[in-house]
């Protein structure tokens, strides 16, 4: 295939625009040679500093190209130019204290320790694991390093220009037009080096599992070499701001990636610590490895939403860049308090430095919470108190009356505990005397270490949650209810904990873990991590690891039991592709067509009789996932064992069972709600019990959804199903209101009649399978709309701001 080259500067010796085609092809314009990049996913490009820029993922993306070193031969003056915008610094080593370097671009064969392999010669722009950067070149085979004092800026373009002057014996390095380093060199010719150009990775093969450690994470754009000293290019400005998040189009062919569950656009995530609502947005902070879908050197990631189902990723909030947190910025909380934080959200996190864990604090520099500054004088708690027998991490701050406290997860005598630290308002310091907030009773029940402790006041009770390690059934999240004593300690109503998830759905680290809990508009909301539990090789291919549960509205009943139901705002995702029936007998299996796919909501009220009933979804032929309630045993079962899937749950074998504490009596209603989002299922039973489960169906045609009854018919009070669309801000019928409850909208023969408080609305009229049979704008407050359909219809009223102001059930 012919490559049509642009007209180049006469002094230009090498030009690589970094515009990579979907098939992985890129090229060097002067020679016309093309090359193929490496990477697990289709190459991703965005508008760059000049044209298109290549987005490297930090664990699989790199290029080994070829240049002709003879074009650099006999040169005494050269100018090298490269545009870079890193998201993070390269991983390099998993658990070692130090800084190691990789090659962003160059032809020098240097290993992680900058040891030269082969003949002395060549050049390289290098980046270190702690943000140091340098330019290396050779003049008369003498190596010269230009090493700026400052770190390379993340999330912005750095235009790196290096001039090598063997006539005037000077090497200089500029960043965005500013001189950042210079070195003297010997007089003579520049040593060109080898023909292999390493882009995004040095020549060595550093891996953990299947993931490269010495790869660059971020944007690379035009690389150029000019004959002579070209200071005029220092004035060049980037054409576009760098965009380091990935758009949904990157995963357009991915049938497994969730679409309305929170998660970063790439990389590895874990605990959702610190959900909050601030300045008109929901914010969720979380553990993130931006360098790939594996766990190491953790940052605080940040996603935002208007509605808790459509998410956008912001830059990382806190990263391991200080001496006290250089190993990682681990979990903690976000806390807002007029006295402690000046009314703005502050981050409290576990800072780890390869020797110990401390507690540090960070403050926002703007009202959008985009930029954070670590508090001067960090850490605020300088290590674990005496008397503990294990680690010290995952802080949580709360107020009780006039007192401010912090609790931190730990262990004492082999059982999980939380330490208690009181804030001294006069000295503005935290106590650290070894006092305990609450302790477990025994290892089998309470585990050996408590991660992610959280305490929230709900009504007149306090809810305490923790995620213990090494219980008798492994890792799962537990809760207690009780009160806070005058000294800040916790007094549980019972020493015996209860499980947040339906017990048979959560053990050994499956299900929702380590929840974050926050309050907004009188609601207490909770969401947590739901791990993939996949092999690293699967995450390598996908480009991401783990997701979060749907937000749940929680409360406590009179006995201190946790009550969980889906966040009411999720109804706004419902599209017009829907199914709805009321008051009928369900026999055998009922197809919910036109509702099918991988983004679904299924909801029904079953009247309990003798026969089993439930839903099936992700179905194709006789292979399907089923959720079944068995009235005779009171058992709820989720069975995915028969579908073609990526196997991830050896302890369950694809079958999850939960015996309801109190089986639903014969003749009473049972409500089942299921949200399906590609590889995660959120289940709610009677708006009381809940579980989140991962499933990874391989079959692209596994989209069918049904409701079913076995061993006889089941009376149905209602059956609803919706295709969900996370891009919607207002959508299909979210509930049906009977005519007896309102006379604003009512039916008569051939007409839907209305008597409205405000004019200038649109009436949408649907049949029971969700088809819009009429849409009519109305400018008055009283009138009627003629319809051809008869029977039960659903009416939605939308005002001129596209807000749903009423939804009704009428008979025509």
Where in the sequence are the language-model features?
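Beta-rich carbohydrate-recognition and catalytic domains
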Residues: 233-394, 399-445, 457-508, 530-579, ...
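Short, aromatic/His-centered strand-loop micro-motif at the edge of beta-sheets
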Residues: 135-159, 645-671
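Flexible glycan-contacting loops in extracellular carbohydrate-active proteins
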Residues: 183-219, 693-718
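Extended recognition patches within non-cytosolic domains
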Residues: 11-12, 172, 219-252, 727-730
């Amino acid at each position: 295939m012919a490559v049509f080259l642009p007209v180049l500067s006469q002094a230009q010796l090498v030009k690589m625009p970094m515009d990579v085609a979907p098939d992985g092809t890129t090229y060097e314009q002067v020679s016309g040679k093309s090359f193929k990049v490496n990477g697990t996913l289709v190459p991703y490009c965005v508008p760059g500093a000049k044209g298109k820029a290549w987005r490297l993922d930090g664990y699989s993306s790199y290029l080994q190209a070829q240049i002709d070193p003879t074009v650099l031969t006999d040169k005494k003056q050269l100018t090298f130019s490269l545009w870079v915008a890193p998201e993070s610094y390269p991983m390099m080593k998993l658990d070692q204290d130090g800084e190691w370097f990789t090659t962003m671009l160059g032809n020098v064969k240097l290993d992680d320790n900058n040891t030269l392999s082969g003949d002395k010669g060549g050049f390289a722009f290098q980046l270190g694991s702690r943000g140091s950067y340098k330019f290396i070149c050779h003049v008369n085979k003498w190596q010269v390093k230009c090493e700026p004092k400052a770190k390379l800026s993340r999330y912005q373009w750095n235009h790196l220009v290096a001039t090598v002057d063997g006539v005037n014996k000077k090497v200089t390095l500029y960043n965005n037009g500013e001189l950042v380093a210079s070195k003297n060199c010997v007089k003579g010719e520049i040593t060109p080096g080898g023909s292999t150009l390493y882009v995004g990775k040095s020549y060595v093969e550093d891996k953990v599992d299947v993931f490269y450690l010495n790869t660059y994470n971020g944007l690379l754009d035009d690389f150029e070499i000019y004959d002579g000293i070209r200071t005029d290019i220092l004035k060049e400005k980037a054409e576009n701001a760098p965009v380091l998040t990935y758009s949904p189009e990157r995963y357009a062919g991915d049938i497994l990636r969730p679409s309305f569950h929170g998660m970063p656009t790439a990389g590895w995530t874990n605990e959702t610590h610190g959900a909050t609502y601030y300045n008109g947005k929901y914010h969720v902070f979380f553990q993130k490895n931006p360098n790939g879908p594996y766990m190491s050197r953790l940052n605080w990631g940040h996603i935002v939403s208007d509605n808790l189902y459509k998410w956008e990723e912001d830059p990382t909030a806190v990263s391991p860049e200080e001496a006290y947190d250089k190993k990682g910025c681990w979990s903690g909380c976000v806390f807002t308090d007029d006295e402690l934080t000046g009314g703005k959200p502050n981050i409290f996190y576990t800072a780890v430095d390869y020797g110990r864990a401390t507690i540090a604090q960070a403050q926002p520099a703007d009202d959008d919470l985009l930029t954070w500054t670590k508090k001067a004088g960090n850490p605020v708690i300088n290590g674990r108190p005496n008397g503990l027998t294990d680690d010290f991490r995952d802080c949580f701050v709360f107020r009780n009356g006039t007192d401010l406290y912090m609790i931190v997860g730990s262990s004492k005598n082999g059982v999980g505990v939380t330490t208690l630290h009181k804030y001294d308002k006069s000295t503005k310091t935290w106590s650290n005397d070894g006092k305990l907030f609450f302790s477990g009773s025994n290892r089998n029940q309470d585990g050996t270490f408590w991660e992610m402790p959280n305490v929230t006041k709900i009504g007149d009770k306090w809810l305490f949650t923790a995620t213990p390690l090494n219980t008798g059934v492994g890792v799962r999240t537990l809760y207690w209810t009780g009160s806070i004593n005058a000294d800040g300690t916790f007094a549980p109503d019972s020493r015996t904990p209860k499980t947040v998830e339906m017990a048979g759905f959560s053990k050994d680290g499956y299900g929702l873990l380590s929840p974050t809990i926050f309050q907004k508009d009188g609601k207490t909301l909770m969401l947590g991590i739901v791990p993939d539990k996949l092999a690293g090789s699967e995450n390598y291919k996908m480009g991401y690891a783990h997701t979060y549960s749907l937000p749940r509205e929680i409360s406590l009943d009179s006995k201190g039991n946790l009550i969980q139901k889906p966040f009411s705002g999720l109804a706004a995702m419902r599209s017009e592709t829907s199914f709805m029936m009321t008051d009928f007998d369900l026999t055998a299996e009922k197809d919910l067509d036109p509702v099918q796919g991988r983004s679904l909501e299924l909801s029904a009220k079953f009247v309990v009789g003798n026969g089993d009933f439930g839903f099936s979804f992700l179905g194709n032929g006789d292979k399907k996932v089923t959720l079944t309630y068995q009235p005779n045993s009171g058992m709820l079962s989720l069975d995915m064992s028969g579908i073609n899937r990526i196997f991830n749950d050896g302890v369950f074998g694809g079958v999850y069972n939960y015996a309801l504490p109190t089986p639903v009596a014969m003749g009473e209603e049972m409500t089942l709600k299921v949200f399906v989002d590609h590889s995660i299922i959120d289940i709610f039973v009677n708006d009381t019990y809940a579980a989140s489960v991962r499933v990874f169906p391989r079959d692209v045609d596994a989209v069918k959804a049904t409701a079913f009854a076995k061993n006889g018919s089941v009376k149905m009070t209602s059956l609803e199903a919706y295709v969900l669309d996370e891009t919607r801000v207002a959508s299909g019928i979210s509930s049906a209101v009977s005519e007896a409850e309102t006379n604003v909208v009512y039916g008569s023969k051939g007409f839907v009649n209305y008597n409205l408080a405000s004019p200038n609305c649109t009436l949408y009229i649907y049949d029971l399978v969700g088809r819009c049979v009429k849409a009519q704008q109305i400018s008055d407050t009283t009138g009627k709309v003629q319809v051809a359909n008869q029977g039960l219809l659903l009416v939605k009223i939308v005002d001129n701001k596209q807000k749903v102001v009423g939804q009704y059930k009428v008979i025509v």
